[in-house]
A protein has these predicted regions:
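Short secondary-structure subsegments characteristic of cysteine-rich extracellular domains
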Residues: 38-54
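Hydrophobic, aromatic-lined core segments that form the binding pocket/scaffold
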Residues: 1, 45, 53, 79-80
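Generic hydrophobic alpha-helical scaffold/packing signal
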Residues: 25, 43, 47, 157-160, ...
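Domain-exit/linker segments immediately C-terminal to small folded modules
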Residues: 196-200
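Conserved structured core elements
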Residues: 14-22, 40-43, 150, 180
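Polyanionic (Asp/Glu-rich) segments that form extended negatively charged tracts
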Residues: 1-33
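Intrinsically disordered, low-complexity N-proximal targeting/linker segments that flank membranes
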Residues: 54-164, 185
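Short beta-strand-alpha-helix junction that forms the catalytic/metal-binding core
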Residues: 154, 166-192
Length: 200
């Protein structure tokens, strides 16, 4: 079972922190064997944990002290429902209203197109089964291993040309970088039909 795939992280490149992978699986194993959490409930809480730990950078920085604190906290946890409640509590402390109102939008407005917040957005799109631009197929279909050989089956394209954005008053590099959509690679070589060509 691939917990990260079920949380929407269908490729290793979408996970910014390898520590998040290791310690999320450690928590999964502790929940399964130590606390005997039911399979359905355990998968649900660990998927939430994966999402929280990857987009907030939970395991970056002083990872050892964070993990030691977790293990110390778990000494006071004795039952399956307490284990789930503990993880929900840590998630809730990270995913506050302020996080969603201020921190996350600021992270998504970053000039980097490869931030943990952006990868979290892609993971959410995968989980929700959202179709790609100009396609009825979900984005997740194009992350399936072997779907397109070694070739990248997802391509990013700008929605509006940079010159047009500058003309209407947008001259911020963040806007230029975020002004894109994922489209299937096979369609990326096909030029979009203009109004003139469709009229003729």
């Amino acid at each position: 079972m691939n917990l990260f795939a079920s949380a929407g992280y269908l490729k290793g490149s979408l996970v910014a922190s390898s520590n998040a992978v290791v310690f999320s699986y450690v928590l999964y194993l502790i929940g399964k064997y130590e606390y005997k959490v039911s399979s359905v409930e355990l998968q649900k809480i660990i998927r939430k944990w994966i999402f929280m730990s990857t987009i907030t950078g939970f395991y970056t920085g002083s990872t050892e002290s964070e993990v030691e604190k977790q293990f110390a906290d778990l000494r006071d946890v004795h039952h399956a429902d307490e284990f789930v409640s503990y993880l929900n509590s840590v998630i809730g402390n990270r995913f506050t209203d302020d996080y969603f109102v201020y921190s996350l939008p600021a992270e998504l407005n970053s000039s980097s197109a490869n931030s943990p917040a952006w990868y979290g957005y892609i993971a959410a799109v995968n989980v929700l089964g959202t179709p790609m631009l100009f396609s009825t197929a979900p984005l997740s279909q194009y992350f399936v291993l072997g779907a397109n050989g070694d070739k990248n089956s997802v391509d990013k394209h700008h929605i509006f040309p940079k010159h047009y954005l500058e003309k209407i008053g947008y001259d911020n590099d963040c806007i230029f970088r975020k002004n894109c959509a994922s489209v299937p690679e096979e369609r990326s070589a096909i030029p979009l039909q203009t109004e003139q060509s469709s009229a003729g």
